């Protein structure tokens, strides 16, 4: 008579499959119903139990992340974008310091992160820039993102020293990144058709030598706003050809044709921020943005304009929980696509719904990463607790590089024309 052991062994895979299915059904995953009714009948249950497990097609599963703020949390009409109250800011600005096992929590900002509060009354240049912006209905990322350097950049000792980063396409973004305080909406107001001309007029009036243009993400537009961005750059160059223009753009949802439109508009520096290391990107940025997609944007700019034809630039925030190896890997990936300039700055939590600061990086650590970036071959690196992607300290160096390259190009073209003229003269004489 046959032993019952082989029969039990044959039944074992089926029992394991049924147990695995039962365990999966108890997990708190959100699932998409496969039909009009999500509750199976008793007859369906019995037939499913008798069927072979591999033949059962599982319902598609998506993960509902309840630990982070969703896009709805950032929608302007559903969640306040007001900054933290002083008492809340004091409570939330904490950091763990000290060696392992002896860590302590501090609730005061490090001295290197404290900056004077800007005042329009104390600085006439600051007041003038602010008045011009209001008069022409223009927005700046300096104000919308609550940049700590606004007093320093806007309050330069003269017009050439003052810097403002103009934010195009309105003050409302279609994305909800968990580090950014810019307003969010699924359907922002329509574009202002007069914005390109108004922006060019304002910049010509200020008499700057270098300007940064950035924008909100406009996923609601077919081209992501690329043509509007490019038209603004062309108007600026028409009014003041000597003005150097840096464009800090979004990823245009990965549409490289739109990247090309902006890259060919006449700008001098193309900036696009990866913001953080690859492993933290899904938690820090809107889920529509990826680290690899950002690399493709930066790489495509070089393909369109040539390796020496344009400077590419990106920025990384520190203090979000990134590891040293993750930061090394991010820099290696950026060099692979020939990024020229990188900046490092301290992440600061703008409101309670945004990500908490994991660590306050010391000035010495920022200097260490600056040296490491330069050793890896980056053309320039601005690194410091209050450095942001458009910080003016980097612009002076980049401006000199651009003007030097422009001068070399002019000399090269002049030599080429002289040689051609000499050859034409010799042909005529012969």
From Swiss-Prot:
Its cofactor is [4Fe-4S] cluster. Residues 156-379 form the Radical SAM core domain. The keyword DNA-binding does not apply. CDD domains: Radical_SAM. The keyword Hydrolase does not apply. SUPFAM superfamilies: Radical SAM enzymes. [4Fe-4S] cluster 2 binds at residues 173, 177, 180. GO terms for molecular function: 4 iron, 4 sulfur cluster binding; lipoate synthase activity; metal ion binding. Residues 28-58 have a biased composition (Low complexity). Its EC number is 2.8.1.8. It catalyses: [[Fe-S] cluster scaffold protein carrying a second [4Fe-4S](2+) cluster] + N(6)-octanoyl-L-lysyl-[protein] + 2 oxidized [2Fe-2S]-[ferredoxin] + 2 S-adenosyl-L-methionine + 4 H(+) = [[Fe-S] cluster scaffold protein] + N(6)-[(R)-dihydrolipoyl]-L-lysyl-[protein] + 4 Fe(3+) + 2 hydrogen sulfide + 2 5'-deoxyadenosine + 2 L-methionine + 2 reduced [2Fe-2S]-[ferredoxin]. Binds 2 [4Fe-4S] clusters per subunit. One cluster is coordinated with 3 cysteines and an exchangeable S-adenosyl-L-methionine. It is found in: Mitochondrion. It is an enzyme of class 2 (transferase). InterPro entries: Aldolase_TIM (IPR013785), Elp3/MiaA/NifB-like_rSAM (IPR006638), LIAS_N (IPR031691), Lipoyl_synth (IPR003698), rSAM (IPR007197). Keywords: 4Fe-4S, Iron, Iron-sulfur, Metal-binding, Mitochondrion, S-adenosyl-L-methionine, Transferase, Transit peptide. GO terms for cellular component: mitochondrion. Belongs to the radical SAM superfamily. Lipoyl synthase family. This is Lipoyl synthase, mitochondrial. The lineage of its organism: Eukaryota, Fungi, Dikarya, Ascomycota, Pezizomycotina.
């Amino acid at each position: 008579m046959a032993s019952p052991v082989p029969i039990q062994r044959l039944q074992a895979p089926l029992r394991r499959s049924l147990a695995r299915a039962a365990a999966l059904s108890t997990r708190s995953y959100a699932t998409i119903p496969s039909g009009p009714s999500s509750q199976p009948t008793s007859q369906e249950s019995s037939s499913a139990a008798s069927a072979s497990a591999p033949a059962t097609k599982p319902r598609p599963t998506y993960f509902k992340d309840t630990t982070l703020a969703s896009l709805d949390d950032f929608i302007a009409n559903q969640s306040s974008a007001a900054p933290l109250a002083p008492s809340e800011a004091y409570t939330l600005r904490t950091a763990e310091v000290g060696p392992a096992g002896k860590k302590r929590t501090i609730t005061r900002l490090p001295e290197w992160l404290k900056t004077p509060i800007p005042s329009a009354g104390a600085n006439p240049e600051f007041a003038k820039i602010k008045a011009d912006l209001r008069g022409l209905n223009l927005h700046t990322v300096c104000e919308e993102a609550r940049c700590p350097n606004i007093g320093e950049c806007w309050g330069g000792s003269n017009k050439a020293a003052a810097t403002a980063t103009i934010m195009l396409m309105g003050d409302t973004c279609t994305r909800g990144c968990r580090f950014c305080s810019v307003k969010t909406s699924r359907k922002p107001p329509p574009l202002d058709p007069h914005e390109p001309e108004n922006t060019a007029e304002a910049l010509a009036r200020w008499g700057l030598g270098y300007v940064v243009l950035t924008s909100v993400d406009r996923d609601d537009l077919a081209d992501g706003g690329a043509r509007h961005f490019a038209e603004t750059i062309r108007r600026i160059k028409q009014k003041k050809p000597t003005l150097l223009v840096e464009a800090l753009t979004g990823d245009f949802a990965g549409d490289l044709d739109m990247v090309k439109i902006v890259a060919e508009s006449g700008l001098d520096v193309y900036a696009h921020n990866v913001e953080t290391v690859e492993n933290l990107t899904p938690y820090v940025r809107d889920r529509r943005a990826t680290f690899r997609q950002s690399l493709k944007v930066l790489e495509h700019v070089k393909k369109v304009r040539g390796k020496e034809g344009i400077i590419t630039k990106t920025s990384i925030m520190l203090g979000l929980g990134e590891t040293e190896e993750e930061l090394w890997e991010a820099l290696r990936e950026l060099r692979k696509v020939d990024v020229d300039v990188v900046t490092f700055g301290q992440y600061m939590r703008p409101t309670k719904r945004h990500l908490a600061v994991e660590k306050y990086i010391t000035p010495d650590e920022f200097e260490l990463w600056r040296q490491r970036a330069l050793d890896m071959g980056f053309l320039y690196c601005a690194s410091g607790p209050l450095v942001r992607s458009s910080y003016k300290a980097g612009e002076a160096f980049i401006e000199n590089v651009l003007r030097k390259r422009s001068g070399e190009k002019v000399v090269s073209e002049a030599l080429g024309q002289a040689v051609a003229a000499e050859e034409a003269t010799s042909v005529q004489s012969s």
